[in-house]
Amino acid sequence: MALGTKHVLHLTKPSSRSSPLNIVIEPAVLFSILDHSTRKSENNQRVIGTLLGTRSEDGREIEIKSCFAVPHNESSEQVEVEMEYHRAMYHLHLKANPREVVVGWYATSPDLDAFSALIQNLYASPAEPGTAPLGTYPHPCVHLTVNTDVSSPLAIKTYVSSPVGITERLADSCAFVPTPFTIRDDEAVRSGLKAVAAPKNDPSRLASLFTDLQQLRRSTLELLSMIERVSDYVQNVIDGSSPANVAVGRYLMKCFSLIPCVEGQDFEKIFSSHLQDVLVVVYLANTLRTQVDIASRLNLLP
């Protein structure tokens, strides 16, 4: 018996193949989004933009490395996204970073509404025949939300989507599925974040760059401070003024086992020898740089 209605409700459960297991976000992306939010138009409640990055071969891990804002007009009735601007910026970005692709989009608002679903489907839709892809199809589209409201805590969330709704409303309907993410936190990033956060209490908000020797001195002082904290903790545990922690004790034993058993005088000789080698390498590198600079200037002479 044939049914007379043409309305079909689509309910697609997100599969493990279409949803990435993990999303890695570079801190520079979050700083860029916060910077974009300060230039928000008065007519719009949020800023949206394109997320760029790389995918693993199986598509189950996405690394978000950069982003750019995309102009749009949003009202209570409709939303207009300037996809030509998105196309031009993406092609310009490919000239500097040819390996990065579109992995999704971001918004400076935690709200998910029909317009969010419309933009999500726009980024996830396949390209027109004969044109270069500008979205994430056939891979899942990542939606990153950053709550930039100064009256609320900074909240970061990532989503992928699954189609849901009747046939006539598939373009502006989808179910956002939360996806786990991590923010990259390696040594280089941590050093940069410390330099950026250093002038947070300074009214001028100016951060000064340190020389290699100054940075070495700061790192040495931080290391001495951490050693003093560990020494005080161990002494307090021995005296019985602080409770013992088995996990901390095992971690300290593991760290101490990695330290070579060297006398103080021998260690000073080894360190001095290593420091002299480093200074020689730096001197030779500066000499070579000077020679190359002189040679390039001599080649310009008639």
Swiss-Prot record:
One of its GO terms (cellular component) is eukaryotic 48S preinitiation complex. It is found in: Cytoplasm. Keywords: Cytoplasm, Initiation factor, Phosphoprotein, Protein biosynthesis. GO terms for biological process: cytoplasmic translational initiation; formation of cytoplasmic translation initiation complex; translational initiation. InterPro entries: eIF3f, EIF3F/CSN6-like_C, JAMM/MPN+_dom, MPN. The modification Phosphoserine is found at S162. Residues 23-165 form the MPN domain. Component of the eukaryotic translation initiation factor 3 (eIF-3) complex. The eIF-3 complex appears to include tif32/eif3a, SPAC25G10.08/eif3b, tif33/eif3c, SPBC4C3.07/eif3f, tif35/eif3g and sum1/eif3i. This set of common subunits may also associate exclusively with either moe1/eif3d and int6/eif3e, or with SPAC821.05/eif3h and SPAC1751.03/eif3m. The eIF-3 complex may also include SPAC3A12.13c/eif3j. HAMAP family: eIF3f. Belongs to the eIF-3 subunit F family. This is Eukaryotic translation initiation factor 3 subunit F. It comes from Schizosaccharomyces pombe (strain 972 / ATCC 24843). The gene is eif3f.
